Amino acid sequence: MYGIEYTTILTFLISFIFLNYMLKSLTRMMDFIIYRFLFIIVILSPLIKAQNYGINLPITGSMDADYANSTQEETFLTSTLCLYYPTEAASEINDNSWKDTLSQLFLTKGWPTGSVYFKEYTDIASFSVDPQLYCDYNIVLMKYDAALQLDMSELADLILNEWLCNPMDITLYYYQQTDEANKWISMGSSCTIKVCPLNTQTLGIGCLTTDVSTFEEVATTEKLVITDVVDGVNHKLDVTTTTCTIRNCKKLGPRENVAVIQVGGSDILDITADPTTAPQTERMMRINWKKWWQVFYTVVDYVNQIIQAMSKRSRSLNSAAFYYRV
């Protein structure tokens, strides 16, 4: 009888000691994991920026304005800036170290050396055919040319907005524009666009579908054409497809990481007359024509004010991507 009681008590004590040991081991293990986790957080925290999914999020649906974010660092410390200029600027300056000089001047405005890229283009016409905007912020300098007003205004409309585009087969199909945001964008070395509106019986309205010479010519030998026709009406098109491509595009909204600066000219380019264009006067501006050195000095002086009217975006613009969202 006493042997059974002693055995029971001994079993209980052994179980208690074993359980106590297991709990202490588990506690030590959890302490190790927690302390190690906290140690890693302490080490990595200076290297990690806080994420705020509301950064630059619009309240009204417009992305033209930046909104304050307590975790957002100074723009120029984490961003790249591309400055696009015509070849004539470099030719006039005629100084092999002029880019280095400007880089040092941008440094005085807070932009580290290496964060500003200078991109040269031959002329407005060639830039219209193949615009490529890859930096976080892009500023395009366009010297006014009366002979290129159409290309300049349409280039501004192209790069200041985002477009969703698809290819068009004008040899097989008629096309219509569904609403004001729907446009046909043509690019090439020479684009001549003719259209013939059709009635419900697919007969030409004021033109013959079998005679291209009766079509209405809406663009002649241009590099870039954004065609706008009457919505909801089928059209037969004639395009110089050997030197031009045409795409059916939908304007999605403003591209906030691009600004256009018109250099000189008595006429001021304005694309805001289009009902689908959100007010963009802050990102399309004009400065008086001066020597190119003076133009660049002006840009350096006001670069941070210009950036404040923009929003950083990661999506790049490449004309080859116009079949998809650009």
Swiss-Prot record:
Disulfide bonds: 82-135, 165-249, 191-244, 196-207
Protein name as annotated: Outer capsid glycoprotein VP7
Further comment: Some rotavirus strains are neuraminidase-sensitive and require sialic acid to attach to the cell surface. Some rotavirus strains are integrin-dependent. Some rotavirus strains depend on ganglioside for their entry into the host cell. Hsp70 also seems to be involved in the entry of some strains.
Processing after translation: N-glycosylated. The N-terminus is blocked possibly by pyroglutamic acid.
Quaternary structure and interacting proteins, as annotated: Homotrimer; disulfide-linked. 2 Ca(2+) ions bound at each subunit interface in the trimer hold the trimer together. Interacts with the intermediate capsid protein VP6. Interacts with the outer capsid protein VP5*.
Sequence segments annotated as region (LVD motif): 237-239
Leader peptide range in chain numbering: 1-50
Glycan-carrying positions: 69
Positions bound to Ca(2+) 2: 177, 228-229, 231, 301
Subcellular location: Virion; Host endoplasmic reticulum lumen
Binding sites annotated in the UniProt record for Ca(2+) 1: 95, 206, 214, 216
Species for this entry: Rotavirus A (isolate RVA/Dog/United States/K9/1981/G3P5A[3]) (RV-A)
GO cellular component: host cell endoplasmic reticulum lumen; T=13 icosahedral viral capsid; viral outer capsid
Span list, region GPR motif: 253-255
GO MF terms held by the record: metal ion binding
Protein family (similarity comment): Belongs to the rotavirus VP7 family.
Keywords noted in UniProt: Calcium, Capsid protein, Disulfide bond, Glycoprotein, Host endoplasmic reticulum, Host-virus interaction, Metal-binding, Outer capsid protein, Signal, T=13 icosahedral capsid protein, Virion
Function per UniProt: Calcium-binding protein that interacts with rotavirus cell receptors once the initial attachment by VP4 has been achieved. Rotavirus attachment and entry into the host cell probably involves multiple sequential contacts between the outer capsid proteins VP4 and VP7, and the cell receptors. Following entry into the host cell, low intracellular or intravesicular Ca(2+) concentration probably causes the calcium-stabilized VP7 trimers to dissociate from the virion. This step is probably necessary for the membrane-disrupting entry step and the release of VP4, which is locked onto the virion by VP7.
InterPro entries attached to this UniProt entry: VP7, VP7_1, VP7_2
Region spans: CNP motif: 165-167
